[in-house]
Amino acid sequence: MADPPDRATGPTRDRIVTAAVETIKTHGLAGASARAIAKTGGFNQALIYYYFPSLTGLYLAALEHTSAARMNAYLARMTDIRSLDDLVRVGGELFDEDVAAGHITVLAELVSSALAQPEIGARITELMEPWVRLTQDTIDRFVRGTFVEPIIQTGAIAQGLVAFYLGIEMLYHLDRDRSRTDALFAMFKALAPIASPFLAASPQPGGENDD
């Protein structure tokens, strides 16, 4: 039987999810007990089990919440990206926002528990799909009309980039050392002017470049 509508949505449920995000962000998954989450949110811990079947269900709801919020933030910034330089700059800014929002911590903590709890791994995989599509759409936009468009598989590249970015996030979560990430974005910034000519649109037959 499905949960009643007031259990699926509403301000109380949102408050519980927000408290879970903040607790995981501050104390990690090991410290995100029902009591700790309730203390963070200032509510009775019995409410957690009224709205969620288990703590795992709440943890996944917390990840869904941060993932949706970050996706909206990324989509809002896509219009700012008109060149590879923009892509590197915006990418660095969004990474900083991911850290501050707690998304990286929530994701990393749940990934670490996925081997022991397959249902978590399956849901994380589902939540990664919109990020792969967003990445592929961005790549398609950059290569459209260029000589590299017919020779690359943007879907495979998108999968690889999302996995690579996830790896960067995992490393940062382990030691909080931003120097590696800074060095990586600095390298991308240096490579952008070199790569840009390869992404210039190819002359079209009948265009103004034709005699």
Segment roles from a protein language model:
Residues 64-69:
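Short, basic, alpha-helical segments at the C-terminal edge of helix-turn-helix-like DNA-binding modules
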Residues 15, 19-26, 73, 77, ...:
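Solvent-exposed, amphipathic alpha-helical segments
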Residues 2-6:
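Short Lys/Arg-rich basic patches
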Residues 15, 19-57, 61:
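Helix-turn-helix
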Residues 61, 72-104, 154-161:
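Hydrophobic alpha-helical connector segments
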Residues 53-57, 78-82, 99, 115, ...:
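Residues in soluble alpha-helical coiled-coils and helical-bundle/repeat scaffolds
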Residues 86, 99-125:
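Amphipathic alpha-helical segments used for helix-helix packing
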Residues 85, 119-125, 129, 142-211:
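Hydrophobic/aromatic-rich alpha-helical bundle segments in the mid-to-C-terminal region
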